[in-house]
Amino acid sequence: AAGPSYTDQPISNMRRTIAKRLTESKATLPHYYVTFDIEMDRVLQLRELFNRASAEAANGNAEKAKDAKLSVNDFIVKAAAIALRQVPAANSAWHGDFIREYHTQDISMAVATPNGLITPIIRNCGALGLSDIGRMSKELAKKARDGKLKPEEYQGGSFTISNMGMMGTSHFTAIINPPQSCILAIGASESRLVPD
C-alpha cells in the first residue's frame, strides 16, 4: 500500500519568526477575549458621503478618486486611536519589569502577504485625519505585499488591528503581537434588523 501523498514546503525566515513570536505570545501573555457587535450605519453613511465628495473633487480623474477613497478600516483605525488616547493602559507594552505607556497611537495593521502576515504601522494616528490614515494605509499595505517595507515601518507599534471583515469572516480571535498589550479583531459588517 502506498503511503500518503504530500509535498513539504520550506518555511521562510519571516514565517519562522512569526510562528515563534505568536507561539510565545499565546504561551506567555494572558489573553482574554471580549466580543460585541456595534452598529455601523453612521460610519457607513459618513464613508459614503466622504467618498462621493472625494470622487466629485477628483473631477473625473478615476485614479485620484480611487486614491482618496476611504475604507471602513480607516474609520476603525481612527476610532481606535481616539479610544487609545482615552484609555492609556490599552496603549501600552509589557517589558518584563515595567509597563511602557505610549503617548502616541502607533497602530499596526495586519496585512497578509505571500510570505506571511506582517504588521506595518500607521504612526501617530491620533494626530492624523481620515484622509491621511487612508493614504498611509494604502501605501503601507502595498509596500507590505510587494515586500518593500523598511524595518522601521513594521517594528514597534502600540496596538494592532486585524480586520478579516473584507473576507466575509464574521468572528475570529487574534493573537496579541508582543510586547503590545492589545489587539482588535474585526469581522464583517452585516445587515440586521435592530429594534428601537
Give the positions of each predicted feature:
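C-terminal catalytic/motor cores of large multi-domain enzyme assemblies
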Residues: 1-196
